[in-house]
A protein has these predicted regions:
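A boundary/linker detector
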Residues: 1-30, 48-52
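Short, flexible, mixed-charge glycine/proline-rich loop motifs
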Residues: 29-39, 70-74
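Generic recognition of well-ordered alpha-helical segments
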Residues: 37, 41-44, 79-82
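Histidine-centered catalytic micro-motifs used for acid/base chemistry in nuclease
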Residues: 43-46, 56-65
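Short Cys/His-centered divalent metal-binding micro-motifs
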Residues: 48-51, 77-86
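Short linker/helix segments within small regulatory modules
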Residues: 62-77
Length: 86
């Protein structure tokens, strides 16, 4: 799937209130695991404050609904712990 197709698919999911399908996709799971590994499963917000918390989520810095073109862009993703992922 190229980026244009990805954006179209995500926009369709948003219109149909089914964005969960994106988060359950193999595309997302693959990138999500890469980010967790690259960031050592560590919450990046806690790390910036000088503490350690294990990451449980991968967060879109620029929100997916506003920026579907960045859905799988690694520079737009960060690991967060449960407390920091709101």
């Amino acid at each position: 799937m190229n980026n244009v197709q990805l954006v179209q698919w995500i926009n369709t999911l948003i219109r149909h209130h089914n964005i969960k399908a994106f988060y359950n996709s193999a595309l997302w799971e693959h990138v999500r695991l890469e980010i967790l590994e690259e960031q050592h499963y560590e919450c990046q917000m806690c790390k910036a404050k000088g503490s350690y918390s294990p990451a449980e989520a991968v967060h879109h810095i620029k929100f997916l609904k506003q920026h579907p073109e960045l859905a799988l862009t690694k520079s737009n993703l960060m690991c967060l712990c449960k407390e920091c992922h709101y």
